[in-house]
Amino acid sequence: MNEKYLPIKIFEKRKEYDDRKTEAGGSPDRDYSWVLHGEPLKQHMQLLTQSLSTMKERCAERKSEGKVLPVVMKTTLHAEALAKTHRKKLVDVLESDGHENVIGVYGDRQILSLVENNAILDKITDVINKEDNASVISAITDMELYEPFIERTESGCGEYRVRLLNYNDYDRNQLVKILFEQHCRQHNIKLNTATRFTSDMYIYRVTIDSADEMNFLEDFEGLYAAEETKPLALTLDALEFDEASMVRVPDPEENYPLAGVLDTGIAGISYLKPWKEAKEHTNYPVEYQNNAHGTFVAGIMEYGDELNSYKVYSTKGIRLFNAVVYPDERKEAIYPEDLVDNIREAVKRNPQVKVWNLSLGIKEECELDEFSEFGMALDNIQDENNVLIVKSAGNCANFMKGLPKSRISKSGDSVRALVVGSVAGEKELYDYAEPNTPSPFTRIGPGPANIIKPDLVFYGGNAGVDDLGNLVKHGVRSFGL
């Protein structure tokens, strides 16, 4: 969902020296050049008072319409009042009725807070009407009713992914889910799926067939955002197919580590069949599977050293748990919500597997100021099941256009996951990267809030463009189908 409209939970201390203070002495309010005084302050006080009066009117309208959820107010901060100290003062004002009203923030300038009744608006008005509070007053640009972000399809109809407001209260979050599902039934909005991404975030997928249905969706009081949803698309970037010189089989006397492969499925080829666990998990029948990608990934895990002339593996083999969580795209579409559901089910039903590989993901790059829903879902799955997911950082083709590398993909911003990027093992004609440096196609960090991602790198191939502008790639080798 568009970063402009997504809330984040990141409060980060300004790294550089705050040079917005003036050199003159005086009261703390006068230490900041953006703090208003005199007539400009009075005019701004009137503006904010009017905004709060409008909020009261909107609250009354909502109540008369029979709405049962509290109103959410959006408070916009001055562009030069983003320091932690100023935000803290503003939060104190928004919670001056003794309740934890702040539920999140929008981008880096807007705070979302609950308005249960007029009492909190009256308390805020009291603060706004005192010139002694010039710094707090000046830090506020506007206060208005929160309006959900709606990204319509070209026709207005189609499938939408819907996210509800998070009220930071279990009972209220349960209520908003019940009300939304009732709202959909009452207005004939087809509710396709409801997927739990985290303990307090569900993503719905609905079908909108008319303008009236779209209007009813927008009118729901607990709506946070709605946008067009599209199926995922899987790509095989910088990969090459090969065969090992001989089939290896497990030594019955050896105790091999076990790893789960969350992918399209591992085919029963002679090289991998001896290493596959007898038990497996699948969300799709055989006729809806295409095992090419999963087989390739499993081949790297099992025969990576031999196929790619490396000598870096510390194990003599690895037991492979096959988890088919992704279908053949030619036969069945899959949406991000489906993939999250499938991963959660596979991990939960197989507690014997503590390390999982996930080389699937989302093409879009992560944001700098908010974690992706997919990444948060992976964190939640790992927390609840006490497992580690090893996740690819993702690839991009920007190097072919002379553009900078994309940041790690959404889902690669999982804090709990071990995210792995790619480095080149060797350099051939037309290859861009020197040995042991980042591959041209690998995505890079940082992640949201400047977290370090990827966590590790491993050999993943090289690539470049020849004299005719054609892609030349020398990827990692594994088994093809």
Residue ranges and their predicted role:
Residues 244-285, 295, 300, 454-456, ...:
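Acidic-leg catalytic submotif of subtilisin-like serine proteases
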Residues 262-265, 324-326, 358-362, 392-395, ...:
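Active-site-proximal beta-strand/loop segments in catalytic clefts of secreted hydrolases
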Residues 213-226, 296-299, 303-307, 313, ...:
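Catalytic cores of nucleotide-enabled group-transfer and carboxylate-activating enzymes in metabolic
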Residues 301, 308-331, 354-356:
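Short helix-loop-beta-strand segments that form the rim/entrance of peptidase-like active sites
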Residues 262-269, 298-317, 344-349:
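Flexible, small-residue-rich helix->loop connector segments that border functional cores
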Residues 255-257, 263-267, 271, 409-481:
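Extracellular S/T/G-rich loop segment that most often corresponds to the catalytic His/Ser-adjacent loop
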Residues 175, 326-416:
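Substrate-binding/access-modulating region of protease and related hydrolase catalytic domains
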